[in-house]
């Protein structure tokens, strides 16, 4: 039963699919239960509220980022909420201005405080979007905030803390693209949010950074997509960066349809597991894709999970027993237009558990984290339990 809370030009390597290590379209069965649902909750007010990301804190707490139109927001604000292990709200902080602003990603700085990434139109005098970066204390106090952009739109992708206390931010830029399309935008900040350096990466068409994580070997991994034709088709894209934001290696892989990576998580050996969606590889429409690369950029396995319609991975994390849990959306299964789609994979990418959560309308998972007690919390959006949209949260153990 769900409870409602009222508080509330680039060098890359193109890989032929025949060179892929263990590229598999998986026929799904019904694996034995691996996770149990602890609780499901929705949080929201009188208008749309959507959760996009989550990060683990101490004592079972978590911090969630999203976009809120409720809670006395202006048009829409970046919304950061700290929740307890049982899903209660400790505090909520709204960030932004008088225009439309969106929260995209959240992580922790070296000193343990919260790093916030969003984008919005409140940070300049025109109607264009800028990147927004902020640092909050663990009790929700604003330490600093900065915005970055030009005379066109910028789009937020991912954020990570650095060894020196600084911040790496990735996203997309139209302002600083030489070709008139989106280029990947990488910004390095010091511990006080001051810009140290920035650079763009791109080809002749759109290039997008969707997510960023720190790897176990102290570097960073960025994932996204590179457009391959003017019809909008794209390839999976990955780039490993060092602490100075310089490229260690990059990979582009895909076929003749739309392939994109939305999220990435580190593995203990310095590699990564990434998830997204594909319309290639004999997909019937759009399927959920998951892949594992080692620290040197070698593709170890690549799995595709999907049914007749639309299935997509939006978030991924490692579980306490060394498996991986992917969260996303599906309209191939379930009761509504879209439902939350959760899959557990073993270290070799084999499906060991899956479950669909949702009701009659749209329920979509956007973020996932492992908590300090080893549980899993998934966040996203729902308009199945009331209109308009609310934060939707699921805790598993």
PLM segments and residue spans:
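Bacterial N-terminal signal peptides that target proteins for export
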Residues: 1-9
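Short, flexible coil/linker elements and helix-boundary hinge sites characteristic
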Residues: 4, 20-21
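Bacterial N-terminal signal peptides
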Residues: 10-17
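A sequence-level/structural motif corresponding to short, flexible coil/turn segments enriched
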Residues: 22-397
